[in-house]
């Protein structure tokens, strides 16, 4: 607890806002492929989407250092969080077929840029002796979101798969965008 309260600077901002990512994306991820199937996307298309997503991540990963150096860590994190998370969440929320998921998968690969810049922000104000604690706090913050998984299950059982997942993607858009603003 003292590590959490003693954080300062960018490390504090990264750790304190990390649960917002978990609360948005971890609720919807277990339903993503089933949602695609419900919209008529075939198994082999889901596999193709996964492959294209990975290729997009490789390309963005290769460019991430240059982009982060050019734009700076904060601006890169803000811009590419919007590109990699907010925009795809909106696309997924209104998705009708394979093509929506394809566009979102390519755009979502940009999270590799944010991962690079965010990791730099996370550690730049943290002393070497505190690094392990900071990474542990980030991991704990992400896992904390698992406590809210029953909310997604309740939404699916109450409203049905398609409307509930669309709502969860809209929720992810709102929370991720708020995380970026904060």
Give residue ranges: language-model regions.
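Glycine-rich segments within core transmembrane alpha-helices of 12-TM secondary carriers
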Residues: 136-153
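Structural signature of the two symmetry-related core transmembrane helices
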Residues: 75-90
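Symmetry-related core transmembrane helices of the 12-TM Major Facilitator Superfamily/SLC fold
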Residues: 166-182
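Helix-to-loop junctions at the C-terminal end of transmembrane segments
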Residues: 60-72, 157
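Helix-loop boundary and gating motifs at the non-cytosolic
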Residues: 2-56
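Residue-level signature of mid-helix packing/kink "hotspots" within the transmembrane helices
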Residues: 54-62, 146-147
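Hydrophobic core of transmembrane alpha-helices in multi-pass small-molecule transporters
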Residues: 19, 88, 99-114
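Transmembrane alpha-helix termini and helix-breaking/packing motifs in multi-pass membrane transporters
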Residues: 34, 38, 148-169
């Amino acid at each position: 607890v003292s590590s959490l309260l003693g954080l300062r600077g960018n490390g504090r901002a990264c750790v304190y806002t990390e649960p917002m990512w978990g609360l948005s994306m971890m609720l919807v991820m277990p339903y993503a492929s089933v949602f695609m199937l419900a919209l008529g996307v075939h198994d082999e298309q889901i596999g193709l989407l996964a492959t294209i997503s990975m290729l997009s991540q490789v390309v963005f990963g290769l460019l991430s250092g240059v982009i982060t150096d050019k734009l700076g860590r904060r601006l890169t994190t803000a811009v590419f969080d919007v590109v990699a998370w907010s925009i795809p969440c909106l696309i997924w929320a209104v998705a009708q077929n394979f093509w929506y998921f394809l566009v979102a998968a390519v755009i979502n690969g940009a999270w590799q840029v944010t991962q690079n810049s965010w990791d730099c922000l996370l550690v730049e104000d943290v002393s070497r002796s505190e690094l392990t604690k900071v990474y542990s706090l980030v991991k704990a913050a992400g896992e904390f979101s698992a406590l809210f998984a029953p909310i997604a299950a309740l939404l699916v059982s109450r409203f049905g798969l398609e409307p509930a997942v669309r709502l969860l993607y809209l929720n992810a858009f709102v929370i991720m965008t708020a995380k970026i603003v904060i």
